[in-house]
Amino acid sequence: MDAILGEVTLSRRRKKLDEMTKGEGLGDAYATTLSRVRAQQRSRSKLGMEVLMWVSHAERALHVDELCHALGVEGSTDLDIRNVPAIETLLACSLGLITVEKSSCTVRLIHYTLQEYLFHNSDLFLGPHSMIAEVCLTYLNFRHVRDFSPTLDSIPPTIPFVGYASCYWGTHARRETTESVKRLALELLEGYDKHISSKMLILHGMDCWGLPLDEDRRPEGFSGLHGAAYFGCEEIMVALLEMNKLDVQAIDLNGNVAMTWAARRGHSGVVRILLQRNDVDTNIADTEYGQTPLSWAAENGHEGVVRMLLEQNNVDLNMVDKYGRTPLSWAAENGHEGVVRMLLEQNNISPDMSDKYSRTPLSWAVGGGREAVVRMLLERGSVDPGVADTQDGQTPLSWAAEHGHEVVVRMLLERDDVDPNIADPQDGRTPLSLAAENGHEGVARLLLQRNDVDPNMIDTECGQTPLSWAAEHGHEVVVRMLLERNDVDPNIADTKDDRTPLLWAAEGGHEGVVRMLLERNDVDPNKADIRYGRTPLSWAAEDGYKEVVEKLLERNDINPNKADIQYGRTPLSWAAENGRNEVVEKLLERNDVNPNTADTQYGRTPLSWAAEGGRKEVVEKLLERNDVNLNKDDTQHGRTPLLWAAQRGHEEVVEMLLKRKDVDPNIADTKHGRTSLWWAARNGYQAIARILLERRDINPNKADTRDGRTPLSWAAESGDERVVGMLLERNNVGPNIADTQYGRTPLEWATRNGHQIIATLLREQLGLVPRYAPSLPSTELSFPEPSEPSEPPSKRMRRF
């Protein structure tokens, strides 16, 4: 232990401790350190052991403030903040056996092995739980706590321990109830209407219990009996009942009586105490869910409580809650075999009662895969295994198949009164269909082994077969089992979109399923759906499933150019737009793939789509084809691939296209007559403008047909000094060309928008060098004297 404490950081201490746990003698090290703790000065020894007791026996990790306040309780009538020790003191007194987690600000033992050591050496602490319970109750009874008006969302920093105290006092009291604990608990619970601390118990304690807190739902009906019943404090419950002041049938804000809480939590001792009274109604239901004590005990699997309640002659075994569910229904769903067995042994039990959704106990047990419960229920001759529920229309077999409960399916199929082909009325799904969709191989195998199972039944929701569902989700083993059946038709398309299993598999990228289906000569690889008219190759190409595309292209009867009916787009078109480089490469390896096929919607080629999207790798692959048409314009805007790339700002694509001599850099779109240079200047794409202007055959003065504006006009208006400078470096640039819409020159556009430097450059280009600048908004400029030498625009631009 000295070696551990000798390390200077917490990380190194833990590392050293982990090394020690691999060897022997760690218990001796803990014993030695605990002896040192006890050998300290009396008050420090007492505090050190109390710290270890709290940290090792608390129900959850305590925050620093919580632990400090807990150790500051001395049994007086109010909290004295002067008695609260500092965390540094606690750390010192425990001699390094505890640590503070910085991230959560909680106090923990230095290692999990110390927790194990303290658990096995329980004689180190005398009555730890009663001591903790006493501190919790004392804290809650403090005048300072009582006088505080609690809120639902926070605990004030002045009383940080109230949260833990209200949530866990009963847990500790149930384990060890001394006379002192009982006295303090009665003071708290009996004085519910007097003490605000009792309300604190509800407001914060119920939050800890996982119950909803609502400011408008005051716990008026809550009494001390509810608290004692919830925690299972038997001696406190007896003491409260002996006072004869509290109504044992009083309900809390959720409509629970004390018996309900005791049964729900499985506190058989408290249930026994309450059952000895004549004024306890064992069939009372809570107002929130309508469940009786028996129903709650059955749902949570508390066999001891269920047994005691069943011994009462007046208990109603078949009483239903607001959902129409019986105790047997709840026990069956949760797989509580012992409870189910006890209930089925009762003569007046109704084992096949349906709830409001027509689900029986068997249906719930099957849905959860509760094999033993299913077996017990099926042994009852009065249980019908073919009853379908009204919510989803599923039978027990359908539920079991959907969730993959193979053993349950086998048990049900052994029954002569179970129809393996029955489809639910809601969407017409058979058990095989559900098993195939979810990939439950064992269930599918059991069903397919039966000759009376129809593998081609289509559902009413989507019109899909089991093979279609399995193919869509890529369940290869199930697909293989289905294809091994001679009566399975692999080409049955669904009735919704007319999609075949192959199309579903291709769209999902399920290469293994595609391979198995294509091995069948009777599978048509070109069958398209009716909604979009797209083939399996089209879907796979769009999503970039290279392996699927390869398998499809291996078929001799594949049509790689088949366009869809909605947009008239080929697989290459879809792959090019989405940047599926490997798919594009595979398609272009085929000589029968036409790279220039334009779609029917916009008249765009694969190169056009790739250029617009900046798919440079795809563009590169397409340019390797000698038969690609570089200047093909679309029917929507009349734009070529170069125009699309320039308009979208894809510099690298523009550069690749311009390397081809057969690309016309001056071609304009047919809609507004805009060139690539026009788009670059308009949108401020300086790099693209530079690349275009490097072409000797570029026309820098070509204006659009809508406004009659040149690239220089747009650059001057937007204030793009670099583009203006690059344009003015061209000897053939017309700096004084006016547009046709407003009749403004580039100089006028620059002046109107306050671009002073550009205006100066244009004046110099035009030979206009005035002494003073024209009046500009909020700015006055001076210009060189006419006698002063003026730098050429190109030299001036190099400064910028």
PLM feature spans:
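Start-of-repeat signature of ankyrin repeats
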Residues: 221, 255, 289-290, 324, ...
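Ankyrin repeat boundary/linker residues
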Residues: 218, 252, 286-287, 321, ...
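Leucine-rich solenoid repeat scaffolds
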Residues: 735-777
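Conserved ankyrin/ankyrin-like repeat signature
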Residues: 235-236, 269-270, 304-305, 338-339, ...
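Leucine/isoleucine-rich amphipathic helices and adjacent mixed helix/strand linkers
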Residues: 1-269
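Ankyrin repeat domain, specifically the short helix-to-loop turn at the C-terminus of the second helix
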Residues: 239-247, 272-281, 308-315, 342-349, ...
